[in-house]
Amino acid sequence: MSELRDTRLEKCQALSDLGQGPYALNFEPTHRMAALHEAHADLPNGEEREVTVSVAGRVMTRRVMGKLAFFTLADETGTIQLFLEKAGLEAQQEGWFKQITGLVDGGDWLGVSGTLRRTDRGELSVKVSDWRMLTKALQPLPDKWHGLADVEKRYRQRYLDLIVSPDSRETFRRRARLVSGIRRWLDQRDFLEIETPVLQSEPGGADARPFETHHNALDLPLTLRIATELHLKRLVVGGFERVYELGRIFRNEGVSTRHNPEFTSVEIYQAYSDYIGMMELTEQMVSAVCQEVCGSCQITYQDTEIDLSPPWRRATMHELVEEATGLDFNSFSSREAAAVAMTGKGLHAPELADSVGRLLNEAFEQAVETTLIQPTFVTDYPVEISPLARPHRSKPGLVERFELFIVGREHANAFSELTDPVDQRQRLEAQQARKAAGDLEAQGLDEDFVTALEVGMPPTGGLGIGIDRLVMLLTDSPSIRDVIAFPLLRPEPRAADAPAMG
C-alpha cells in the first residue's frame, strides 16, 4: 500500500509539472450522468451526436487497449463510459493520450468534455476531447465486485462503502426521503417543528442513563438530552397546540443491532387528542410515508412479507401475555404470586421488577415482544413503568399508553399525556426515589416541568417514533448500524498499542 501511494504521489508531481496540478479549484459539468442518459436516450446504436457535453465524477474502472482506452466515470446519479482515442486526443494536444492513460488511476476525480456516441451494444459514451484532473486519489478503491467484505470496515470507512455499494447509497437516499416525508406530512397538517435544548440540567422524558458533561463558564453540570418530551409539553402549555421535533437523542446505553447511543427520533404532541387519536395518526403517517418511499405499503423485511396498510392490529398487554403464557396478571394479588407463576412458566422474574405491573412488562418482553411481526399496537400499560402517561379511563392500575411493534421490535411509544400536576409530582418523586436507590435509568424530578403543568396543559396526545428503526424496516437492513451513516464504534487500537507478536 505504501509503494502504491508513493507511485500516486509521483503522478501528482507529474501533473504539477505539466501545469495541471492534482487538485483543481472547480469544474462546470453540463450534465449529471442520469440527466445525460435521459436527454440522449433517442441516440441510435452505432451513431454519434455532434454535441459537446462536460461531465465530472470518479473513475471507477479503466481499460487501456493499445491506442484506445475506456474509463467508467461515476457521479451521484449514475455512470457513463468514456471513450478515449489516441488520434483524437493527440490532435488536440500532443501527449494527451499518454498522460491520461498513464496519470489517471481508479478512484481519481476527473472532468472531461467531448461529443456523444452510442456503441453497437447500446452503451452511451463520451468521446473525450478534453480532460482535467480534479482530484488525484492516493488510496486505491476496494474491489468493485466484492466491496468491503469486512462489515466493521464498512461502518468505520463509510466513504468507501458508499463508493462501491449502490445498496448503501440507496439506503441513505431512502432515509433522507423518509425524514423529509415525515416533516412534510406533519407540516401539511399544521404541526409546527420547534427545536428544544440538547444540553439540559435535568434530563427527563424517558427511562435512560444520560451522557454527562460540564459547562465551564457557568461551572454547571449538564447532560445530553434523552428525550424531547418535557420541553415539547412546555410548548403545548405555552399555546402551541400541534408541535413536534425530529432530532438527535443521546442515551448512555449498550450497543446492539437495535441500539446506538446516538439516534434519531420524532416526538409529536397534539392538543385535545389522546392515545387513540395518536394510534390513528401513527398508522396514517407511517403508511403514507412508506408508500412515498417504497412505492407500496407491502414490503419485505428479512424474507418476511409485512403489510403496513391501515388499520393495524390493536391488543392490550394483558391479552397478549395471557395468550402467550396462559398467565392472567389481573388475578395476582401480590408481586410474589406473580413471580411464582412466571417461574412456573419458565420466565425470569427479576428482583428489580418490584410489582405485579413490572412483572407483567417482564413477561411481555420475554414471551410476546419478538412474536409481533405484523404491525401491532400494544395498549394499556402498567402505571409503574409509565410515569408520564394519563391513568386509564376505566382500568385501575393501568395508563393510556401504546407501543407499536413490527418485526418483533418497538417502533413507537405514545400516551394520553398526564396533565394532573399533583399526580405527576407524586410519580416523579417515586422515580426520584428509585434513582436515589441506584436505578441509573430512573427519571429525576423536574420542578419547572411540574410548574408548567400547574399553569395548565390541555388534554394532549403524545407520540415518539424511532427514525432509525423505521429506516431499517423500509430498507430491509438487519442492523441499526446499516442505516446510520457514522455509527458509534470503539476506536481501533493504534499501532503502538497493539499487542506484540511472536
Swiss-Prot record:
NCBIfam families: lysS_bact, PRK00484.1. It catalyses: tRNA(Lys) + L-lysine + ATP = L-lysyl-tRNA(Lys) + AMP + diphosphate. Homodimer. InterPro entries: Aa-tRNA-synt_II, aa-tRNA-synth_II, aa-tRNA-synth_II/BPL/LPL, Lys-tRNA-ligase_II, Lys-tRNA-ligase_II_N, Lys-tRNA-synth_II_C, NA-bd_OB-fold, NA-bd_OB_tRNA. It comes from Parasynechococcus marenigrum (strain WH8102). It is an enzyme of class 6 (ligase). Pfam families: tRNA-synt_2, tRNA_anti-codon. It is found in: Cytoplasm. The gene is lysS. One of its GO terms (cellular component) is cytosol. Its main location: cytoplasm. The lineage of its organism: Bacteria, Bacillati, Cyanobacteriota, Cyanophyceae, Synechococcales. Mg(2+) 1 binds at residues 403, 410. This is Lysine--tRNA ligase.
